[in-house]
Amino acid sequence: MKTFCGRANPTTGALDWVEESEEYDYHQEIARSCYADMLHDKDRNEKYYEGIRAAVRRVKARGERPVVLDIGTGTGLLSMMAVTAGADFCYAIEVFKPMAQAASCIVERNGFSDKIKIINKHSTEVTVGPDGDMQERANILVTELFDTELIGEGALPSYEHAHMHLVQTGCEAVPHRATIYAQLVESDMLWKWAQMRPIDVDGHRLMPPGAVQECAGAPSVCDIQLSQVPTDAFTAISPVCTMFSVDFSKPVSSAAQSYTVRFKSQTGGRAQVVLSWWDIDMDPEGNIVCTMAPSWSYADPHAYPWRDHWMQSVYFLPAEENVSEGEELMLMVSHDDYSLWYSLTHSEQNDVRVAPFRPCCTCQAHLVWTRPRFGELNDEQRTESYVSALRSILKPDSVCLSVSDGSLLPVFAHLLGSKKVFSLESSGMAKQVIEQVLHTNSLKDGVQLLGIRAEQLSLADLDGNQISVLMGEPYFSTSLLPWHSLFFWYCRTAVAQLLQPDATILPRAATLYAVAVEFQDLWRIRFPCGTCEGFDVSPMDEMIQRSLDFRESWEAEPHPLWEYPCRALTKPCPVMTFDFTQCVPEQPISSDGAVPFTGRGRCHGVALWMEYQLTDDISVSMGLTKAVSQEGACEWNPHRKQGVFFFRSAKETSGDGREDLSYSLTFEPHSGDIKMDFSITES
């Protein structure tokens, strides 16, 4: 059965009504998931297997019959491990229907259907008894309910319910316990992702609103590959602190709680950020440990087991605080059902028993600007590029129109002396944030904010003025892939009749770049696994492949490549250019070509990004920020996501000119889509 669904088009800005199968969302979720990453996580799989074997041995040593409950079974891998380890029977719970179906197929293919029962329910809906989903309570509880924050997927309520209704008192648990660690640091790089900094523009200092400076920030965790944050980008104020542990073999409470750790400051500085991660002990003795600690905490960083389904967390303190070396401080972590947050105090006091309120944004800026967006707005070099470009084109009689979400460009244009500045801010919340910036800096009359879309704009909205400068970063909150910011082009086309004949467009053009790459690790999220710890999990590979094929074409996907090291195997190549000085054309734009491979390696796919030509002399890159090194090392813009086009399988390249990266792209103006195909061909 098919239904018509309204989907907002991030490139054209239109609401597209498309006919979709009722299975569309299922396939989208599977295609965008990273299930394969878990199966490729050898460290995780080996530790779980070892822990399960030990738990089964302990139950048998007590003279009991091992009965396992596996909550969040996924592929059924842990259940198959349990049965292979000697469990008598296993109840495997999986709430996501396509996943439960895949688990049933995998269990059957491996010959465990008589020992494993797949239950397609949420664990809190499972019943026990002669007519229930489970015939009896389990004496071994195996789970993989964790996310980067440990408890963000509802682990605590699930454990709480399981101990009350699904497992025996004194059951074995794998993992047996989890421990949260934290380190208080000063980091200019990371703090720029939390607060707006003063910005200098031609002798004017643009100050952040007081409400923004005093705001506790976004409530959600910032999860990143902390191993990619250079150690010289932060200074440790505290040692690594053990904040608290949860014993999963005993009844677990999901009630809000707080834990405090005292320490003496290792150095003076500004306490700004808490770096946090966790580990899980698979056995009571703590001999089998799976840790999320970043690579720089290892004696040998090369021994670090890469994974993307569990990363590390960055928490921003509500406000930065000055601390002195040797000062006694207290770091407190609090949690509710699903999230953690941290606070710092200097004074002596008793441990807080009741968790304080979870911090939340009160200024709206942290809801309008994402953390990478804060970093982008605080990027001095980037700001200088835009200011220099504006300085070169603005005149005293310039009438400017800005088209970008929550942008400071119109403020810059006013400070640089433009006669009139208008800015389209169709989001009411973004409009209020920019109003705060203008009010704080006594610029309220300098920029006229219009809460309408480009196609609604009229000459009356512009006080009868025609536009002499149309500008944009461009940045739009709805953009996922680099080329979604072509929405600027559609806005430019919509206001074409309001432009002066000789109007300047900034940026004047955009170029889509591509480079073939070998990923150090990111390939694991997309490449088939086949077998995992001796079990055939190929039905999972097939399910992911079917979901990827469900779309009409092989698509690129967004990733922040600064977190995922890769090596360039070709030179960066411009593959399509979009001329913003002209309106969006009626006919498709096509581009075909080939670029030789210059590096030897395994090509996993193609990285894609936009570069904007602000003027003839000034460009800003949303991708590579430096020339690729001779060895192929890439440095990526940390504030924007790049596109990645994964090949269906890795291809070996010689780098001696025998292979080319061939490309074929077509931009469809009516849909805003770029159909793309990349292949490796013999020269």
Swiss-Prot record:
Signal peptide bounds: none
Any single Gene Ontology cellular-component annotation: nucleus
Positions annotated as active site in the UniProt record: 144, 153
GO molecular function, one term: protein-arginine omega-N symmetric methyltransferase activity
Reactions that this protein is recorded to catalyse: L-arginyl-[protein] + S-adenosyl-L-methionine = N(omega)-methyl-L-arginyl-[protein] + S-adenosyl-L-homocysteine + H(+)
This protein's UniProt keywords: Chromatin regulator, Cytoplasm, Differentiation, Methyltransferase, Nucleus, Repeat, S-adenosyl-L-methionine, Transcription, Transcription regulation, Transferase
Principal localisation: cytoplasm
EC number, UniProt record: 2.1.1.321
CDD domains found in the cross-reference section: AdoMet_MTases
Top-level taxon: Eukaryota
Bilayer-crossing regions: none
InterPro entries with a match to the protein in the record: Arg_MeTrfase (IPR025799), MeTrfase_PRMT7 (IPR014644), PRMT_dom (IPR055135), SAM-dependent_MTases_sf (IPR029063)
Entry similarity comment: Belongs to the class I-like SAM-binding methyltransferase superfamily. Protein arginine N-methyltransferase family. PRMT7 subfamily.
Role according to the record: Arginine methyltransferase that can both catalyze the formation of omega-N monomethylarginine (MMA) and symmetrical dimethylarginine (sDMA), with a preference for the formation of MMA. Specifically mediates the symmetrical dimethylation of arginine residues in the small nuclear ribonucleoproteins Sm D1 (SNRPD1) and Sm D3 (SNRPD3); such methylation being required for the assembly and biogenesis of snRNP core particles. Specifically mediates the symmetric dimethylation of histone H4 'Arg-3' to form H4R3me2s.
Name this protein carries in UniProt: Protein arginine N-methyltransferase 7
Organism field: Danio rerio
Classification lineage: Eukaryota, Metazoa, Chordata, Craniata, Vertebrata
Encoding gene per record: prmt7
